[in-house]
A protein has these predicted regions:
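Short beta-to-alpha linker loops that shape the active-site pocket of alpha/beta-hydrolase fold enzymes
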Residues: 10
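Mid-core helix/loop region of P-loop NTP-binding domains shared across ATPases and GTPases
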Residues: 3, 13-133, 141-173
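Walker A/P-loop
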Residues: 1-7
Length: 174
């Protein structure tokens, strides 16, 4: 069996400390721990036991992973990449998502070697792709005839010209 978990590492009070990140993952696995107060080693022990109880492959997606290392350093990644040595009945697989293509270059060599990284680089969206995304989003978000003709096209063009970032286009549409 496979269980997928998603954590946005840019969110405050979710991934701004190692303790909070592990506590959030524990919460995603169905158990609550106090938001502060326990020694980090004890939080990790709870985490290990809980993972092993799952008896499955856990796919942990860390969005904005570069923000995680920027806030905490790369010790957290080192610990997460070595966790499978502690587990007997489960496995943890990490997927990191980042817009910063060079953040890996600044990691400690021990962390880099344990990542077993495989990079997938997605090119920026073009104006037509962004336009398609915005049309679908606007159909769900707005009542009919609220978005004036040409607005989606203009937002798409601006966003594609800047960086091809769909999030920026959605912000413009708002």
């Amino acid at each position: 069996p496979l269980k997928a978990m998603y954590i946005n590492c840019k969110l405050k009070r979710v991934a701004d400390t190692e303790y909070r990140l592990i506590a959030q993952i524990i919460k995603e696995l169905g158990q609550e721990i106090p938001p502060t107060g326990l020694p980090t080693d004890e939080v990790y022990n709870i985490f290990y036991k809980l993972l092993d109880q799952q008896k499955q492959l856990i796919l942990l997606v860390l969005d904005e992973i570069d923000q995680l290392t920027k806030k905490m350093g790369d010790d957290i990644l080192y610990n997460l990449t070595r966790i499978n040595t502690e587990l007997k009945k489960a496995q943890l697989c990490l997927i990191g998502i980042s817009n910063n293509l060079i953040f890996v270059e600044n990691l400690d060599p021990r962390v880099k070697s344990s990542l077993s990284e495989e990079e997938l680089i997605f090119p920026p969206y073009n104006a037509l792709q962004i336009q398609d995304i915005l049309k679908k989003r606007s159909e769900r978000a707005f009542s009919p005839n609220v978005v004036q003709p040409g607005v989606i096209e203009k937002c798409s063009a601006y966003s594609a010209r800047d960086h091809g970032d769909a999030r920026r286009a959605i912000d413009l549409l708002r």
